[in-house]
């Protein structure tokens, strides 16, 4: 099963050149991310990988990285191709955690989307792909406010068969 998990602003923005605008400001979202992905397999792009000093605990950490990317930090495993990786792990629970290019590359195969909707436009330069035609909203939690930022959690389930 392939799940994509992301926090997005009202324009589906996920990051800008300085990183994730709400990073560290909404700890409930960070806890939600940990709770959902714990004990699972996570797949991230190289840019997302560079944001981590160490692998995420209680998870298998895979990075889509080109051979010329150099040696990865201990605890991370490089994979050359997301599609091939997903073919090999098709029966496992895999979480794609970013970045924007990897979300776009894997959306057609995703079974579920777990989104944190952050209220406002944070002038992001990197975006989550449009998805509403292939997915149906399954649940939407009540809003939270932390550090002056309003957000809520959504779960979307695929309604149109995934493509490989």
Residue locations for each model-derived region?
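Enzymes that bind and transform nitrogen-containing heteroaromatic metabolites
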Residues: 1-164
